[in-house]
Amino acid sequence: AVAAGKHVFLAKPVAVDVPGCRSVEESGRKATEKQRCFLVDFQTRTDPFYREAVKRAQYGDIGRIVCGEATYFCGPTWGDQAKWLAEKPGDPEMRLKAWGLDRALSGDVITEQNIHALDVAAWVLDAAPLHAVGSGGRKARTAGTCWDHFSVTFTYPQDVLVPFSSTQLGDGWDDICCRMYGTDGTLDSHYFGEVSIRGRLPYRGGKIPGRYQDG
């Protein structure tokens, strides 16, 4: 598409491995050179409350950013895909159809879904993480090959640490959140809830009525 001079709109995951990510990155670079749009769909990036809060944090309203935290807690996902796999276990066509529960095809939950919370941290810091250390596992999920919990600490430039945790374990706490802590305040953002800043220069913020309808 880039070679043909077209605009590109991508949904996540843009890739599931390092070579794929590098290929997409290079395509984005070429699109910019050609003055073509190359956009990855994150609803938060078009949310006016997220945009204003991030802008204020980057302008220094929360002071020097010291650290952050991100979470993605929810129940099991891809229920229909789990049924398909149960009906035809080992069927190659069903594996492709149920890609969201396949680690090799989806990049696992942390790549395919959790990226919504992780992207906010990278957006606020305007940087990619330098390295990450963590683990996870699969103790409740029975369908597919994806894990059901993660715990990872990302290190950003200036030694800014952003610990991240994720679960998909039945009914319970449900929140997609990213908080960034500064010397003068805190940016508090919730994917399906309020976005605000508390501190020396507060921002009341708010939330849009429907994430998928309006995002």
Predicted regions and their residues:
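Phosphate/diphosphate-binding loops
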Residues: V162-F164, Q168-G170
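Short hydrophobic-aromatic micro-motifs
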Residues: V162-P163, L187-S189
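Surface loops and adjacent helix of pleckstrin homology
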Residues: T167, Y191-F192, R200
